[in-house]
Amino acid sequence: MVHFSGVQLLLMFALFALAVLLPVWAIRRIARAVPPACRAPGVAGGVGGLLLFTIVLLIIEAVNALYHFGRAAGEAARVISMSTDYLWPVVQTMIPDFAASFFLLIAIGALVFGRSPAALGAAVVCAWLGGPLVAILRTIYLGLPIELAGEPTGLLFLTVVVTLYLLFANRPALTYGTASGRRLAASRGGSADGARA
């Protein structure tokens, strides 16, 4: 059994926090350079608040998937170096985490750089593909049982909450210029082209 000292645990926590906070800071700076698709006086728009928190949740999920993918790739290299007979079974174990990383990074990119309803739709679809669907793939490929308090259920709940927020809240509607965001901007005397109202 592996035992970690307090300093090692603190270092791992600091590295994980840095791996999350540094991209969040960079994403906030980059995302604020791209104006929201619509503006309405008195209503927050652009990447910030709960929308930034939603992106942070997706970043945490993506960092976790990338970590598991990297760990599985290291184990795969070790097993393949011993015998190439196990190439496909070993590669199979990496497919879910690779898919999760891929789709979650697309969702994050769409939310940060996109300012259209299509970008919002792509982010929602990729969040579903990178979250619960990949967790179900993991149970299929790795033969893990589906438990009520397990990963697929938790990711399903998180993805439902994220989807409801992205589709029905005012900030994402204004940021990505959905029909409800354009109506809100028009009703408040704002603009629908990203210019300051």
Predicted regions mapped to residue ranges:
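Short, strongly hydrophobic alpha-helical membrane anchors
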Residues: 1-7
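Cytosolic juxtamembrane helix and N-cap/initiation of the first transmembrane helix
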Residues: 3, 17-67
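Cytosolic juxtamembrane helix at the C-terminal end of the final transmembrane segment
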Residues: 24-45, 108-123, 162-190
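A loop-to-helix transmembrane entry motif
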Residues: 84-101
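Non-cytosolic membrane-interface motifs at loop->transmembrane helix junctions
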Residues: 144-154
